[in-house]
């Protein structure tokens, strides 16, 4: 896989995370409370400062009342 494509995916995921939180009408602090993490964790995840693993992604989706498969499909189709 080309580095440019790899880098693009890492930029798309944080955007999707932020979009899902906003769509759910949650602040960073409210989502953090649902996930039992700090708001700094949410901020760093949404800015790409830290990577999110697949289990964290699934938990994030569920906390935002979004189907993880639907969200992952959206991410996979993003360009």
Task: Set out the residue ranges of the language-model regions.
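Short amphipathic recognition helices of helix-turn-helix/homeodomain-type DNA-binding modules
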Residues: 70-79
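Short basic helix-loop element that most often maps to the first helix and adjoining turn
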Residues: 15-34, 59
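Conserved hydrophobic/aromatic packing and binding residues within compact polymer-binding modules
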Residues: 17, 31-32, 42-45, 71
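DNA major-groove recognition helix of helix-turn-helix/homeodomain DNA-binding modules
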Residues: 55-71
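Recognition helix of helix-turn-helix/homeodomain-like DNA-binding domains
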Residues: 36-52
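Helix-turn-helix/winged-helix DNA-binding modules
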Residues: 12, 23, 49-52, 63
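A short, Lys/Arg-rich alpha-helix, primarily the initiator
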Residues: 1-23
């Amino acid at each position: 896989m080309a580095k440019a494509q790899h880098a693009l995916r890492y930029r798309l995921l944080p955007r999707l995370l932020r979009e899902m939180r906003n769509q759910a009408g949650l602040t960073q602090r409210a989502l953090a409370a649902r996930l039992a993490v700090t708001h700094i964790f949410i901020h760093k995840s949404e800015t790409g400062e830290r990577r999110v693993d697949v289990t964290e992604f699934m938990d994030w989706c569920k906390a935002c009342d979004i189907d993880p498969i639907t969200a992952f499909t959206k991410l996979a189709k993003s360009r």
